[in-house]
Structure formats: C-alpha cells, structure tokens
UniProtKB/Swiss-Prot annotation:
Family: Belongs to the protamine P1 family.
Gene name linked to the record: PRM1
Function: Protamines substitute for histones in the chromatin of sperm during the haploid phase of spermatogenesis. They compact sperm DNA into a highly condensed, stable and inactive complex.
Location in or out of the cell: Nucleus; Chromosome
Gene Ontology BP, a term: chromosome condensation
Protein name: Sperm protamine P1
Pfam family, one: Protamine_P1
GO MF annotation terms: DNA binding
Entry's Gene Ontology cellular component terms: nucleosome; nucleus
Superkingdom, taxonomy of origin: Eukaryota
Keyword line: Chromosome, Developmental protein, Differentiation, Disulfide bond, DNA condensation, DNA-binding, Nucleosome core, Nucleus, Spermatogenesis
Quaternary structure and interacting proteins, as annotated: Cross-linked by interchain disulfide bonds around the DNA-helix.
C-alpha cells in the first residue's frame, strides 16, 4: 500500500515499514496494521487529506 512514515510526536520511535529505512528500529507496535496507522501514517493520505 503506502509507505508509512512516523508522526512528529512519534519521531523518537521511528516506525518505518519494510524496506523504508532501517528495519532495526522497527517496533512491535508498528508491525501490526491497526497500531501502525496510529504511530505511522500513510504519506499519500497526509498530503491528499488537507490539500
């Protein structure tokens, strides 16, 4: 789907999706899709939502 990017509030714990950046920083909370949406948000949605 879309590449997940960490929100500013969660910039400390970077939760990137597979192949996005360093998978070593991947957290279990971001592994699941439901929690991933909370910590990371799709890139195309952030720009298309308020533009």
């Amino acid at each position: 789907m879309a590449r997940y990017r960490c929100c500013r509030s969660q910039s400390r714990s970077r939760c990137y999706r597979r192949g996005q950046r360093s998978r070593r920083r991947r957290r279990r909370s971001c592994q699941t899709r439901r929690r991933a949406m909370r910590c990371c948000r799709p890139r195309y949605r952030l720009r298309r939502r308020r533009h």
